[in-house]
Curated annotation (Swiss-Prot):
Binding site for substrate: 278, 350
Cited Gene3D superfamilies: 3.30.70.2510, 3.30.70.3190
Reactions accelerated catalytically: uridine(54) in tRNA = pseudouridine(54) in tRNA; uridine(55) in tRNA = pseudouridine(55) in tRNA
HAMAP family for the chain: Pus10_arch (MF_01893)
Function per UniProt: Responsible for synthesis of pseudouridine from uracil-54 and uracil-55 in the psi GC loop of transfer RNAs.
Enzyme active site: 213
UniProt source species: Thermoplasma acidophilum (strain ATCC 25905 / DSM 1728 / JCM 9062 / NBRC 15155 / AMRC-C165)
GO biological process: tRNA pseudouridine synthesis
GO molecular function: tRNA binding; tRNA pseudouridine(55) synthase activity
First-tier enzyme category under EC: isomerase
Family stated for the protein in its record: Belongs to the pseudouridine synthase Pus10 family.
Name of encoding gene: pus10
Pfam families: Pus10_C (PF21238), Pus10_THUMP_arc (PF22023)
Sorted UniProt keywords: Isomerase, RNA-binding, tRNA processing
Name of the protein described by the UniProt record: tRNA pseudouridine synthase Pus10
Length: 389
């Protein structure tokens, strides 16, 4: 059984001594608890002048709780004029300090709390009092990480997320930026660069509900996306001017139904799988037999097809055979060696390969049913069949 007076053998301040018994005598602070312990030790040892060491000489905290003003100034300098409403505090202490505290607490019954927990709580109270911002563990706008040993701070500003839908009117534009193609417009850059400027952010990422090929236009009711802007200085701003600037830029992208969203929307958008309707301009190396093509379209309607990963994407996709349903294939018209066809198909269907057969990797294909090679000359997505559309 330990005696309280044994605490006098350690170089501890009042706060760190009180924290050893944090789960006793509720309703008081660790500093107040340390005051009681100091008095009790003085009585137990017959030394009324006994006192714990000053915090700056404490072997556990080294006076970190007296440096809140300095830490605040470091945080304020890093945050600058960035907007935020909620914040969270985290901290890093030397492992030697953590182990020493744990050993002492074990000796006295292991009923204390860690210095990290108290620091995070107390600096959080201090920071909230100075800024008027709310301490929150639930998705905070600002996360503060304090290195107590070196008095270094790092801050992380939570990204903002903007939901919307886009149309793409060009046949030379990928959806997202490529590492091997850093220059040139993309849907991501056309949208993201403008939003990032308005938000005062440092980078951006477009998360789309699927993607169309570079040479495929996205028309009709548009494709859903969530744009993530990293390290925004401004969390709230008018969206209409941003939308107008993007839509009048002449870069071939139009956005609509735009609103602020959350990180959860990223996974929601990416997980959604919707049937799509395509307008395909199909070409043959000889004049097209309209009646044969019409029969092929009718025969392909309602069929399940089997698609092995296309050769054009095999280097970056798993080599699998996928089953896809073709809901409707309608022949719109024929002109010489070209034909316009409307195709409604399950999400994930490779439409170009549905038409050309990809050397037998897609079966049945329109070419197979027509009895002669066909290829897609131009392709547009004209509708994504979402529930609300």
């Amino acid at each position: 059984m330990f005696q309280i007076s044994e605490l006098a053998n350690y170089r501890l301040c009042k706060r760190c001594s009180g924290r050893i018994f944090a789960y006793h005598y509720h309703g008081i602070s660790n500093l107040e608890r340390g005051e009681y312990l100091q008095f009790a030790i003085g009585c137990e040892t017959g030394n009324p002048d006994f006192s714990f060491v000053d915090s700056k000489n404490c072997d556990i905290c080294h006076g970190i709780f007296d440096r809140f003003d300095d830490i605040y100034d470091l945080v304020a300098k890093k945050v600058g004029d960035a907007q935020y409403s909620t914040f969270l505090v985290g901290s890093v202490f030397p492992q030697d300090t953590i182990r020493m505290e744990e050993d002492i607490q074990k000796k006295f019954g292991s009923s204390g709390e860690s210095i990290k927990k108290e620091f995070n709580r107390e600096f959080g109270k201090y920071f909230s009092a100075r800024t008027g911002k709310e301490y929150s563990q639930d998705n905070p706008d600002l996360t503060i990480l304090v290195n107590a040993e070196y008095l270094f701070v790092d801050v992380k500003i939570r990204s903002i997320y903007i939901y919307g839908k886009y149309r793409k009117f060009r046949r030379d534009m990928p959806q997202t930026r490529w590492i091997h193609r850093p220059n040139g417009d993309t849907v991501e850059s056309v949208i993201g660069s403008v939003f990032t400027r308005y938000a005062g952010g440092t980078n951006y990422y477009l998360h789309g509900s699927g993607r169309e090929d570079v040479d495929v236009r996205m028309l009709g009711n548009g494709r859903e996306f969530v744009l993530e802007v990293e390290n925004p200085r401004y969390r709230e701003f008018e969206l209409d001017p941003v939308v107008k600037e993007i839509n009048t830029s002449g870069k071939g992208v139009e956005i609509f139904d735009v609103k602020f969203s959350s990180h959860d929307a990223v996974s929601e958008v990416k997980l959604e799988k919707h049937r799509k309707v395509y307008d395909a301009l199909v070409v043959s190396d000889r004049p097209i037999d309209e009646s044969r093509l019409l029969e092929a379209c009718i025969n392909l309607t309602g069929k399940n097809i089997y698609q092995r990963t296309p050769l054009r994407v095999a280097q970056r996709r798993s080599d699998l055979v996928r089953t896809r349903r073709i809901d409707q294939v309608d022949l719109v018209g024929v002109s010489a060696n070209e034909a316009e066809i409307l195709i409604s198909a399950e999400a994930g269907t490779y439409i170009k390969e549905l038409v050309n057969g990809d050397g037998g990797r897609t079966r049945p294909s329109l070419s197979e049913m027509y009895g002669s090679p066909l290829n897609v000359k131009e392709l547009d997505v004209i509708k994504i069949c979402r529930g609300e559309d």
